[in-house]
Structures are given as C-alpha cells and as structure tokens.
Regions:
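Short, cationic low-complexity segments
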Residues: 174-195
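Catalytic core of non-heme Fe(II) oxygenases with the double-stranded beta-helix
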Residues: 69, 78-140, 147-175
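A short coil-to-beta-strand element that immediately follows conserved catalytic motifs
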Residues: 64-74
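Glycine-rich loops and low-complexity Gly/Arg-rich segments
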Residues: 29-33, 99-104, 179-184
Length: 195
C-alpha cells in the first residue's frame, strides 16, 4: 500500500485559513449540490494562490514527488438528507490524477477512510495521502442516523506537471468563469458504489 495517513497536517494558522475558505465557499456556492450516489454535497473549489501553494508544498513533500501540480480540488460534505445515507464503495480512482490529499476540514463523527485493510480516522486537520489510482479505498457503514452529523473534506487531486491532464486542466482553468461554471453544473459523479 502506497497511501498513508497524517494527523495535524497543517499548523493552526494555515489550517484556520483553509477551513475558513472552505466554509465561506460552501456558504456562497450556488452549485454545492447533493448527490444521492454518495450521500454528499459536492462541487469543485478554487483556492487562492497562497492556499494552493501550501497544498502543493504539502503534497510534494508528503508524496516525495517534486513536480506535482493541482488538477482540481473537490469540496464535499457527507450528510444524511431525505433518508439518503452517505456511502462509498470499494474502488480505485479512474481519473487522471495520480495523487490525492484527502483532508478532513470538519467532522461531527469518525467515519474512517479504509485503504486496503487499514482504517484512517476522520479527524479534523488530518489527511490521507492517497494513491487512489493504485490502492483500493472505501468507507465502512455510515456510523450515524442523525441528520445533523457530517464530514466536510476536500480532495486535492494532483498529477505531475508535464502530464497531459495538467495541460488539459490548465486549458480548462483559462476559460471564462461563466463557461467553467456552466460545465461544472453538468458534471455527474461516477458511481463507485456500483462496483
């Protein structure tokens, strides 16, 4: 298994900046929509350069890969809604990112990410440095029936700077904001729970 877990990934000041940005993003997003596939709200999030640079530095150091760049970052909030319970079936990621930081921003419960046979806790300011393209991962049965419980996380997806997906990602990011937003509204998550 190439994935690993780390608690207290960021110092208090840096984590506070990330957490504040995520909460403002969730509050102000018109497209933070709920998908019944996973039982979560989700969309993509564009951090400012300071936070992006911090995330890149953390990934490069943790994975020991010095040319990782961000492909995209997903913001999620797992929560029961209208009787739909969060779930994540066992799968390998089938997109072009090669490394993912799965960072817990806030949580009212511990709903671990299982990688291989190892459960990694959902603690605030912890991260799974995930080789999701190689390591099978899932989550166990959701541990609550309370609709007020939740897990807020970001999935920062990386690939080497010279990869084709980074070139495509950069072209997408260069499109006008309204075009990017219109395209994002049409994105549908892949249902890994079918596997």
């Amino acid at each position: 298994m190439k994935s690993f877990y780390q608690e207290n990934v960021f110092n208090d000041i840096d984590f506070g900046l990330i957490k504040s940005y995520v909460f403002k993003h969730i509050e102000s997003s018109s497209d933070f929509n709920y998908t019944k596939i996973y039982g979560r709200y989700w969309n993509t999030i564009d951090f400012n350069d300071d936070i992006n640079n911090l995330l890149i530095k953390t990934a490069r150091s943790g994975f020991d890969v010095d040319d990782l760049e961000i492909v995209y970052t997903q913001c999620v909030k797992y929560q029961i809604k209208d009787g739909v319970t969060p779930s994540l079936g066992n799968h390998i990621d089938d997109f072009y990112a090669t490394h993912t930081l799965n960072i817990i921003i806030d949580s009212t419960l511990d709903w671990p990410l299982t990688v291989g046979e190892v459960d990694f806790p959902s603690l605030t300011n912890s991260a799974v440095f995930l080789k999701g393209d190689e390591d099978f991962h899932s989550r166990p049965k959701y541990p609550s029936k309370n609709e007020n419980d939740y897990v807020i996380a970001i999935f920062v997806n990386f690939a080497p700077a010279n990869s084709e997906i980074i070139k495509k990602s950069n072209r997408f990011k260069s499109l006008p904001k309204e075009v990017r937003e219109a395209m994002r509204l049409k994105m549908t998550p892949n249902d890994v729970n079918l596997y």
